[in-house]
Swiss-Prot record:
CC cofactor note: Binds multiple chlorophylls and provides some of the ligands for the Ca-4Mn-5O cluster of the oxygen-evolving complex. It may also provide a ligand for a Cl- that is required for oxygen evolution. PSII binds additional chlorophylls, carotenoids and specific lipids.
Modified residues (N-acetylthreonine): T15
Protein keywords: Acetylation, Chlorophyll, Chloroplast, Chromophore, Manganese, Membrane, Metal-binding, Phosphoprotein, Photosynthesis, Photosystem II, Plastid, Thylakoid, Transmembrane, Transmembrane helix
GO molecular function term, any single one: chlorophyll binding
Gene Ontology CC annotations of this record: chloroplast thylakoid membrane; photosystem II
Entry keyword annotation includes Transmembrane: yes
Protein name, as recorded: Photosystem II CP43 reaction center protein
Organism lineage string: Eukaryota, Sar, Stramenopiles, Ochrophyta, Bacillariophyta
A Gene Ontology BP annotation from the UniProt entry: photosynthetic electron transport in photosystem II
Function: One of the components of the core complex of photosystem II (PSII). It binds chlorophyll and helps catalyze the primary light-induced photochemical processes of PSII. PSII is a light-driven water:plastoquinone oxidoreductase, using light energy to abstract electrons from H(2)O, generating O(2) and a proton gradient subsequently used for ATP formation.
Pfam families recorded: PSII
Similarity comment: family membership: Belongs to the PsbB/PsbC family. PsbC subfamily.
Length: 471
């Protein structure tokens, strides 16, 4: 291949460990070093090394970050007040957590962190081996692991294997929830507890009803799930569908319409993957912000509506003890100050929190009757744990506003408190958005290449290539 630049210009930038290794330079790949794994499109062994090393980095982060959180854990404070995002995920699996969402032991978290660190070392070694010492391509030495991007049957077989692995992962959660100690259920009586999910929902009308719901208003799409039976039942269905679909793709060849409809190249597969990850990222952002079943508020802090309703409830409890008649007191607008009716006639909390009248949360549900909040329960059956939890949630809204939002004063929170819901929602949203941009970019390039026209910028026309070296 014709040299497009002065080699001397780049000597200080890159000194290859072994210049004979494939995928190292622009002459052998057509891509410069900053193009990353594009250099490895046609060297499957080196691409395997890159992916294994990347997996090692991810596992290392998980292990190191869990140990970091464990080392900073303060038992007297809730996890959502300590800037954690990983301990909560382990706690929801039933590890180290007791009634009311109290962290009872950090030993399981320490063990998980160490296991991840050890695993990352193994993956890291595998990544280095395949990047530097292993065969450049797998097709000759290990035909089962080798592939050609244009081999449609092989590509769908690889897809099938991935689907089967995802299905197995889904069933691991099901097994943990049903047989291996259970999972944390925020809806358990008395404020949440670890329990076995003995009767998961298997009714397809219920499970797939979430998928076909509207994402707007009170419908909430899949994010509206509000009980552990549906969550575990959903994982059973997902696991079954993934494994059945995986077996299908392993043992069949793509139909003619699929061969015509899709672009079959490495960059096309990358774009498909980026689109899938983007969708998962957006879904995770919505879940972490709105859902208080998969993301229990005892661990992640209240949702925005939950904090607002908590404040209304806290002031209702206070003023009722001071002698206020909470069922008839009027606010400055003439509407109910503490209680009022929703558009559908339910009794709801009054004041600015009325906008969140359809909130469902474990601490308030015991106070409801057949027509919204039960006046008799409000006056005679409020439990201390409900008061404590509402008072705590009231001051920990996941809001960064400098003024009142939904009736919740947030100026203090904007200074010294950031909810894990804010972190998780914003990070997943922005990452998902940029993954979507990546999907558009790579899908456009893949389609252009398949159509036979421009593949990137012609480097031969870059002015810098005709300039003399700096030194």
């Amino acid at each position: 291949m014709k040299t497009l630049y002065s080699l001397r210009r780049y000597y200080h930038v890159e000194t290859p460990f072994n210049s004979s290794i494939a995928g190292r330079d622009i002459e052998s790949t057509g891509f410069a070093w900053w193009s990353g794994n594009a250099r490895l499109i046609n060297v499957s062994g080196k691409l395997l090394g890159a992916h294994v090393a990347h997996a090692g980095l991810m596992v290392f982060w998980a292990g190191a970050m869990v140990l970091f959180e464990v080392s900073h854990f303060v038992p007297e404070k809730p996890t959502y007040e300590q800037g954690f995002i990983l301990i909560q995920h382990l706690a929801t699996l039933g590890y180290g957590i007791g009634p009311g969402g109290e962290i009872t032991s950090t030993v399981p978290y320490f063990a998980v962190g160490v296991i991840h660190l050890i695993s990352s070392a193994v993956l890291g070694f595998g990544g280095i081996y395949h990047s530097l010492l292993g065969p450049d391509t797998l097709e000759e030495s290990f035909p089962f692991f080798g592939y050609d991007w244009r081999d449609k049957n092989k590509m769908t077989t690889i897809l099938g294997i991935h689907l089967c692995l995802l299905g197995v992962g889904s069933f691991l959660l099901v097994i943990k929830a049903m047989y291996l100690g259970g999972v944390y259920d925020t809806w358990a009586p008395g404020g949440g507890d670890v329990r076995l999910i003995t009767t998961p929902t298997l009714n397809p009308i219920v499970i797939f009803g979430y998928v076909f719901r509207s994402p707007f208003g009170g419908d909430g799409w899949v994010v509206s799930v509000n009980n552990m039976e549906d969550i575990i039942g959903g994982h059973i269905w997902v696991g079954l569908l993934c494994i059945i679909g995986g077996i299908w793709h392993i043992f069949t060849k793509p139909f003619a319409w699929a061969r015509r409809a899709f672009v079959w190249s490495g960059e096309a597969y990358l774009s498909y993957s980026l689109a899938a990850i983007s969708l998962m990222g957006f879904t995770a952002a919505l879940y972490s912000w709105y859902n208080n079943t998969a993301y229990p508020s005892e661990l992640y802090g209240p949702t925005g509506p939950e904090a607002s309703q908590s404040q209304a409830f806290t002031f209702l409890v206070r003023d009722q003890r001071l002698g206020a008649n909470v069922s008839s007191a009027q606010g400055p607008t003439g509407l109910g100050k503490y209680l009022m009716r929703s558009p559908s006639g339910e009794i709801i909390f009054g004041g600015e929190t009325m906008r969140f009248w359809d909130l469902r949360a474990p601490w308030v549900e015991p106070l409801r009757g057949p027509n919204g909040l039960d006046i008799n329960k409000i006056k005679n059956d409020i439990q201390p744990w409900q008061e404590r939890r509402a008072a705590e949630y009231m001051t920990h809204a996941p809001l960064g506003s400098l003024n009142s939002v939904g009736g919740v004063a947030t100026e203090i929170n904007s200074v010294n408190y950031v909810s894990p819901r804010s972190w998780l929602c914003c990070s997943h949203f922005f990452l998902a958005f940029f993954f979507l941009i990546g999907h558009w970019w790579h899908s456009g390039r893949a389609r252009a290449a398949a159509a036979g026209f421009e593949k990137g910028i012609n480097r031969a026309n870059e002015p810098v290539l005709s300039m003399r070296p700096i030194d």
